[in-house]
From Swiss-Prot:
Keywords: Activator, ATP-binding, Cytoplasm, Nucleotide-binding, Nucleus, Phosphoprotein, Repeat. InterPro entries: AAA+_ATPase (IPR003593), ABC_transporter-like_ATP-bd (IPR003439), ABC_transporter-like_CS (IPR017871), ABCF_EF3_subfamily (IPR050611), P-loop_NTPase (IPR027417). Interacts (via N-terminus) with EIF2S1; the interaction is independent of its phosphorylated status. Associates (via both ABC transporter domains) with the ribosomes. PANTHER family: ATP-BINDING CASSETTE SUB-FAMILY F MEMBER 1 (PTHR19211:SF126), ATP-BINDING TRANSPORT PROTEIN-RELATED (PTHR19211). This is ATP-binding cassette sub-family F member 1. GO terms for molecular function: ATP binding; ATP hydrolysis activity; ribosome binding; translation activator activity. Residues 47-65, 148-161, 208-227, 521-542 have a biased composition (Basic and acidic residues). SUPFAM superfamilies: P-loop containing nucleoside triphosphate hydrolases (SSF52540). The modification Phosphoserine is found at residues 22, 106, 110, 141, 167, 557. The keyword Phosphoprotein applies. ATP 1 binds at residues 298-305.
């Protein structure tokens, strides 16, 4: 007779009891003492029936123990049942095909087949029938039932554990235990999915047999194993059906989406942003905690505004429950009054008011069913503070410089700067979850900045501000985000705290760099080549950096370690040449009256003068004539009555808000200075460099420069004029913080007179300027310091000055 059975349909390999020359026969005979006589196919079926009866009793007891556990798992199965329904239908088709193939083989056994070894019954199966077809039908029903209870496990990762469980279940009783365990060693992995499912069912039943319910420790292990069992579903599903890839990925996305929908903070890791081929952010991380007020700082042109726009446009993964607003565009110019433009920003309030009017009309027509809904509408209106909405809108507009008449003026009658104020008022009125302000003080006068500063200190929601006003950042912000080297770095505290920490960090980096250079010199002096010395130093640096990362719990950089470079400090230095001494009177207005045609006079009988050591800051609300006063002093406006007097040798350097108008846009900055002052090429470039204009911008047409770069060209021009008096009208617009610091230092070092109009509180205080306020058609000096003036401004608006402790 043949040494092996005839070819069967794909089934798990099994070891028969017949004669065989394979090495596994020795293993089987070693553990089976009952294989002394050979049994026919039908005799073995009878033995199987008896074994099935015994197993059935044991399984009934097991089923009672499993019933409680199955009830707990029922809810989980129900949720997964719908998702697996399609897979089960596909599996049923495969099972039917397998059954058809098995039935074709179920013919009366031939002489050779009678001597062929019969398959060993699978452990844990209930063979109720008295023949092979009954056993197969029973197996099929159990497979279908088990597949509904548990999705199939992947066969490959669990190969060893499944084979062990199957070998232990093949025959009951301790008699053949050793032989069964050794038989499993020679057993191949299942050849199809149904065999794998059978093996997993046997494994589950064996685990239930070994882990009794009273043993709580084993119960916990069982639950943990079942959780792992469920996590492995995805891998098997992906291997069997392409559509399962979509469902699994969708489930994962749904889980992430659910987390986002409940998030109150923003956490974005490893994002990159490029603009016009230039990388602005590379593997940067953004963390914004709800309720904190962040200041985003860094040099101009590095991507601060770009980041705000990406957040506002939701180009980054912002949680959908966080409403984001970036105040960047002026309000539409139309017939809408300013106060109504602010009120209409709250669309929820408008919808509730519209519904209230509709329900009131239904009640008047006798429809009593609207009463309940109307009461709920009233509750929502009360909760949103609808009754106080107009008062709130007018308070915000007043703080930003709108008097009662201006609040009712149509927006089309305002200039662009005032429409920007209306837009800012709308943003403050709406109170979004995350409010982003990009240079909010640029279009404001000093009084409006004082009010906004005070108002935002009480802001309870999340705030992200880009500003060049250090005093504003110091008062408002609780955290600073520093954009440096295409990454975002976080510092707790206001700008002053950040500045101290950053300077200390730079000092430490400089010490490390100097230590590294010293080590390189020592290695070279000891006979090492430059390449060897750098390699050895780099290895030592790598170890030290890794130690620092572990200490600070920082993520390890993906970049290859490099030698330290000298820390580059972004420094800007403004310098104005000192003027020669001039005898007084230097510059003054005497009995001046002035007003624009068709308007009320701004000044009447004004007397105002300066000396060479004067440091004066002109303050006052918008529209009172601050810029007009500067134009009268420079001689660009002629008084209606009175006169302007000045020293005949006096040279005035004037920086106007509309400085771009004095530049020739078709020229390069170098050409502009060369033509105006007959300077050599290199001298012109040196002058531009002293005011922080990058070297590559020296030869670009002025029309292609940014606002900040154009401002530096104007400052360079002022220095070339060698003025005796500097008259500056809002000089900090478009300058970054470092440049404003440099301007303040230059003013302090300058020996001539300075008159400035500025909304930057820090520039005013650090230059020790005397405050002169324009009011009631005159100019007068203020008694007290800048804090006294702030208090006076807020009290006039009915506000209370906030004094926040420094963090």
């Amino acid at each position: 007779m043949p040494k092996g059975p005839k070819q069967q349909p794909p089934e798990p390999e099994w070891i028969g009891d017949g004669e065989s020359t394979s090495p596994t026969d020795k293993v089987v005979k070693k553990g089976k003492k009952d294989k002394k006589t050979k049994k026919t196919f039908f005799e073995e079926l009878a033995v199987e029936d008896r074994q099935a009866g015994e197993e059935e009793k044991v399984l009934k007891e097991k089923e009672q123990q499993q019933q409680h556990q199955q009830q707990q798992q029922k809810k989980k199965r129900d949720t997964r049942k719908g998702r697996r329904k399609k897979d089960v239908d596909d599996d049923d088709g495969e099972e039917k095909e397998l059954m058809e193939r098995l039935k074709k083989l179920s013919v009366p056994a031939s002489d050779e087949e009678e001597e062929a070894p019969a398959p060993v019954p699978r452990g844990g199966k209930k063979n109720k029938g008295g023949n092979v077809f009954a056993a197969l039908i029973q197996d099929q029903s159990e497979e279908e039932e088990e597949e509904e209870k548990h999705p199939p496990k992947p066969a490959k990762p669990e190969k060893n554990r499944i084979n062990k469980a199957v070998s232990q279940e093949q025959q009951p009783g301790p008699k053949g235990r050793k032989g069964k365990e050794e038989k499993s060693k020679g057993k191949a992995k299942p050849q199809n999915k149904f065999a794998a499912l059978d093996d997993e069912e046997e494994q589950d039943e064996e685990e239930i047999k070994e882990k009794e319910p009273p043993k709580q420790g084993k119960e916990k292990a069982k639950k943990a194993e079942q959780m792992e069992y469920e996590r492995q579903v995805a891998s098997l599903k992906a291997a069997n059906a392409a559509e399962n890839d979509f469902s699994v990925s969708q489930a994962e996305m749904s889980s992430r989406q659910a987390m986002l929908e409940n998030a109150s903070d923003i956490k974005l890791e490893k994002f990159s942003i490029s603009a016009h081929g230039k990388e602005l952010f590379v593997n940067a991380d953004l963390y914004i905690v709800a309720g904190r007020r962040y200041g985003l700082v860094g040099p101009n042109g590095k991507g601060k505004t770009t980041l705000l726009k990406h957040i506002a446009n939701r180009a980054l993964s912002i949680p959908p429950n966080i409403d984001v607003l970036l105040c960047e565009q002026e309000v539409v110019a139309d017939e809408t009054p300013a106060v109504q433009a602010v009120l209409r920003a709250d669309t929820k309030r408008l919808k509730l008011l519209e519904e209230e009017r509709r329900l009131q009309g239904q009640l008047e027509q006798g429809d009593d069913t609207a009463a309940d809904r109307l009461e709920k509408v009233y509750e929502e209106l009360r909760a949103t503070g609808a009754a106080a909405a107009e008062a709130k809108a007018r308070r915000i507009l007043a703080g930003l410089g709108f008097d009662p008449e201006m609040q009712n003026r149509p927006t089309q009658k305002f200039s662009g700067g005032w429409r920007m104020r209306v837009s800012l008022a709308r943003a403050l009125f709406m109170e979004p979850t995350l409010l982003m302000l990009d240079e909010p003080t640029n279009h404001l006068d000093l009084n409006a900045v004082i009010w906004l500063n005070n108002y935002l200190q009480g802001w309870r929601k999340t705030l992200l501000i880009v500003s060049h006003d250090q005093g504003f950042l110091d008062d408002v912000c609780t955290d600073i985000i520093h954009l440096d080297a295409q990454r975002l770095h976080y510092y707790r505290g206001n700008y002053m705290t950040f500045k101290k920490m950053y300077q200390q960090k730079q000092k430490e980096l400089l010490k490390q760099y100097e230590k590294q250079e010293k080590k390189l010199k020592e290695l070279k002096a000891g006979g090492k080549s430059t390449k060897q010395a750098e390699k050895q130093t780099k290895e030592a640096l790598t170890r030290k950096q890794q130690k620092c990362r572990r200490k600070n719990q920082d993520e390890e950089s993906q970049e290859a370690p490099e030698l330290l470079k000298r820390p580059k400090e972004y420094t800007v230095r403004f310098t104005f040449p000192d003027p020669p001494p001039l005898s007084p009177p230097v510059l003054g207005l005497h009995g001046v009256t002035f007003g624009y045609e068709g308007q009320k006079p701004l000044f009447k009988n004004l007397d105002f003068g300066i000396d060479m050591d004067s440091r004066i800051c002109i303050v006052g609300p918008n529209g009172v004539g601050k810029s007009t006063l500067l134009l009268l002093l420079t001689g660009k406006l002629t008084p209606t009555r009175g006169e302007m007097r000045k020293n005949h040798r006096l040279k005035i350097g004037f920086f106007n808000q509309q400085y771009a108008e004095q530049l020739r846009m078709e020229e390069t900055p170098t050409e502009y200075l060369q033509r105006g002052f007959n300077l050599p090429y290199q001298d012109a470039r040196k002058c531009l460099g002293r005011f922080g204009l990058e070297s590559h911008a020296h030869t670009i047409q002025i029309c292609k420069l940014s606002g900040g770069q154009k401002a530096r060209v104007v400052f360079a021009e002022l220095a070339c004029r060698e003025p005796d008096v500097l008259i500056l009208d809002e000089p900090t617009n478009n300058l970054d913080i470092e440049s404003i610091d440099a301007l303040g230092e230059a003013i302090n070092e300058y020996k001539g007179a300075v008159i400035v109009v500025s909304h930057d509180a820090r520039l005013i205080t650090e230059t020790n300027c005397q405050l002169w306020v324009v009011e009631e058609q005159s100019v007068s000096q203020i008694d007290g310091d800048f804090d006294d003036y702030k208090r006076e401004v807020l009290e006039a608006l009915g506000e209370v000055m906030v004094s926040r402790p420094r963090e």
